[in-house]
Amino acid sequence: MGLHDEARLDHKMMLLIKQLNLYLNHFPKHEKYGLCQQIRNAAYDVYGMIVEAQKRYHKKTTLSSLDIRHEQLRMFVRVAFELGYFGFRNQAVSSDDPQGLAERRFHTLGVMIDEIGRMLNGWIKAETARQSKVQ
């Protein structure tokens, strides 16, 4: 993965974190230190692991861990959607079409998470190809 692609991945991850934090601020108060915190930590971990993978010479194990943490982030967001937390506005269920609001928010995050996942998989494939050339 080239330097330009890595910068794009950083940028995409930062956009995801901003959007996640915007939506997570509306979760119910009883989830502030539960699922909400798990999602935030997973997003921050993914961002930190991206930086770590960019700096390491041997990237394969870091990229593998990064891929796992990315899947955990995807799973946590899915759990929040299934529990109906994306339908909340200001810690209360939205009065105007909470299901529609939840679906729009989940779709927005899903698209962003999927795009980052495709970029990570491309990076993993490029790194695997690079390592097989060296051997």
Labelled PLM ranges:
Residues 1-135:
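Amphipathic alpha-helical assembly/interaction segments
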